[in-house]
Design a protein with these regions (language model features):
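N-terminal [4Fe-4S]-dependent radical SAM core
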Residues: 1, 137, 141-180
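Glycine-rich beta-alpha loop elements in corrinoid/cobalamin-binding modules
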Residues: 2, 18, 25, 34-153
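Nucleotide-activated donor-dependent transferases that construct or modify glycoconjugates
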Residues: 2-11
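Hydrophobic/aromatic residues located in beta-strands of well-ordered beta-sheets
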Residues: 3, 34, 88, 137-138, ...
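Short N-terminal binding/cap micro-motifs at the start of the first secondary-structure element
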Residues: 12-18
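Proline-aspartate-enriched helix->loop->beta-strand connector
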Residues: 56-60, 222, 345
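Catalytic cores of alpha/beta
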Residues: 99-105, 270-272, 330-345
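Radical SAM [4Fe-4S] cluster-binding motif and immediate context
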Residues: 161-317, 327-329
């Protein structure tokens, strides 16, 4: 079996964890040949198609994002015309909703995957060429032989701690200026604009397991780690444990964290004050300074607490903090966005 992964990014500075995360789970399977073709959304589509076509894969797979979806469709349309026997499966945040219209409008897409794939994708590979057996694959959406839409819900990894880390895949890219590290999956918050909103319970990795992964990252000389946790400080005790762990790698590694300024406990504030210069780069999730916008978006946390927390973070001389505002949220008008920018400045 030959799987070709279409790695389509906005630039070569960016890389996705999707391929190494999936490959790591079944890397020992000698019956599978993996190929990756990397490209950017600004490259010539014909050249990309040609570089893929020459491999004649059994399976074409890719992750669709907002920024690459249009170009990916153009590529896949041409590929399926040239390789009609190849099975095309797509995944990613673009498929978190109802996928029936998408599949009917793009019949060359054999199936799309909704949710977390590390456990379910290997299941699908065991029957990829037997669509009559797809009904038991969590997260898979497809049109069956009777032209009926089949929706297998959303896939959730049942044993997060047991996953093989993506760093152990030979597709993991150590050449980028930073690497991404996931220490939790899911989020306590319910933000309507986030793909993890309401994804409970939050699943965590043990501190010792994270330490081992950071040691490997350190051995590769990586200087910057972007922690992918949706809300680093959702739990004060765990946040403090992670900060103590990060200190073990200071000053060699700098950590980028997403933090909710409305949820800063006094205990965590004191911890942040004591950290060495440059250990952290904080991304404070403000999103909007207008309460109706936050309420409609179902974002938890009082606005007054968020402003107070942001002021505290910006006052810390030992770390860099930037605040996030999200244009396009419901009830969020352009004039209010400019007003919020002025307030933050």
């Amino acid at each position: 079996m030959k799987i070709l992964w279409i790695d389509l990014n906005s630039s070569y500075a960016h890389s996705s964890l999707a391929l190494p995360a999936l490959h790591a789970q079944i890397a020992s399977n000698q019956d599978i040949e993996w190929i990756k073709v990397s490209a950017t959304i600004n490259e010539n589509i014909g050249m990309i198609v040609d570089s893929i076509y020459r491999h004649h894969p059994d399976i074409l797979a890719a992750t669709a994002w907002l920024f690459n979806h249009e170009q990916l469709l153009h590529i896949c349309t041409r590929l399926k015309a040239l390789l009609p026997q190849s099975c095309l499966i797509l995944g990613g945040p673009e498929f978190l909703g109802d996928n029936e219209a998408y599949l009917r409008n793009h019949p060359f897409v054999n199936c799309v995957f909704r949710g977390e794939g590390e456990e379910a994708f290997p299941q699908w590979l065991s029957c990829w060429n037997q669509p009559e057996q797809w009904a038991h694959i969590p997260g898979l959406c497809y049109i069956d032989s009777q032209q009926q839409y089949k929706d297998n819900g959303i896939a959730r990894v049942q044993n997060f701690q047991a996953l093989v880390p993506p760093e152990e895949s030979y597709f993991f890219n150590w050449d980028k200026p930073f690497v991404q590290l996931e220490t939790t999956r899911g989020c306590f918050n319910t933000c309507a604009f986030c793909v993890s909103g309401g994804e409970k319970p939050v699943r965590t990795l043990p501190i010792e397991q994270i330490r081992e992964r950071l040691q490997l990252i350190h051995q590769h000389g990586i200087r910057n780690v972007r922690v992918l946790d949706r809300t680093f400080n959702y739990n004060t005790r765990r946040a403090k444990e992670l900060l103590q762990l990060f200190l073990e790698f200071s000053p060699d590694i700098r950590f980028h964290l997403e933090i909710h300024p409305a949820l800063l406990s006094e205990e965590l504030k004191e911890e942040l004050k004591q950290l060495p210069q440059g250990l952290l780069h904080l991304e404070a999730g403000i999103q909007s300074l207008h309460a109706p916008v936050l309420e409609r978006s179902r974002r938890m946390g009082k606005l007054e607490d968020a402003l107070e927390g942001l002021k505290f973070l910006c006052s810390l001389p030992n770390m860099e903090t930037h605040a996030d505002l999200i244009a396009g949220l419901p009830l969020y008008h352009l004039s209010e966005i400019f007003e919020d920018i002025r307030t933050c400045l």
